[in-house]
């Protein structure tokens, strides 16, 4: 069953049609928009700083989202995909962003809209990622501008696929066993 816990009187809040895998963890001051999915072994920890997640966001397997006590918050826009085992820490990710597998985005970084953070990249504290670009490497540096077809062909495609994947669970789990949560059909 997903771990959904209040911390210091602040409880997670979920929009409509959100899927939480049976072993996902969401705690504390977390607000999640409509049509989001939080996959296996993902941790969204709003205990020391608030976390706001927009609509149509997929937080893939093994992702950790957290902040720094009394210093940072996490803000994630709409239509965002956060790849397997990425770490999102005390930063802002604007709309229509793809964060690649194993990437790390540190405190006070801002990832501009329509951007891609390559797999394994490390976005250092305070870095500003330009809108419409691909950044990669350690530390992350600009690789190139994103052509418009890559935005629809990559960023939008992945976000839309995760809506489909969550739908598979919703259809197969009319009465979800093993603790899977599909909001609002299962509370």
What are these regions (language model features)?
Residues 9, 14-68:
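A positional/architectural concept
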Residues 81:
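Short proline/glycine- and basic residue-enriched helix-capping loop/turn segments at helix->loop/beta transitions
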Residues 1-10, 47, 53-55, 61-64, ...:
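Glycine-rich hexapeptide-repeat left-handed beta-helix
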């Amino acid at each position: 069953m997903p771990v959904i816990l209040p911390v210091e009187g602040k409880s997670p809040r979920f929009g409509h049609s959100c899927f939480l895998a049976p072993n996902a963890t969401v705690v504390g001051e977390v607000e999640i928009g409509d049509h989001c999915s939080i996959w296996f072994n993902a941790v969204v920890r709003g205990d020391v700083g608030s976390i706001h997640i927009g609509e149509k966001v997929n937080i893939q397997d093994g992702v950790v989202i957290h902040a720094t006590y009394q210093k940072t918050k996490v803000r994630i826009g709409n239509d965002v995909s956060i790849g397997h085992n990425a770490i999102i820490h005390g930063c802002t990710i604007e709309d229509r962003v793809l964060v690649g597998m194993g990437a790390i985005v540190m405190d006070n970084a801002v990832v501009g809209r329509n951007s891609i953070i390559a797999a394994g990249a490390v976005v250092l504290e305070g870095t500003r990622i330009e809108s419409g670009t691909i950044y990669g490497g350690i530390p992350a540096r600009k690789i190139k501008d994103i052509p418009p077809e890559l935005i629809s062909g990559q960023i939008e495609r992945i976000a839309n696929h995760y809506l489909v994947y969550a739908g598979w669970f919703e259809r197969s789990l009319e009465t979800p066993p093993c603790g899977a949560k599909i909001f609002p059909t299962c509370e």
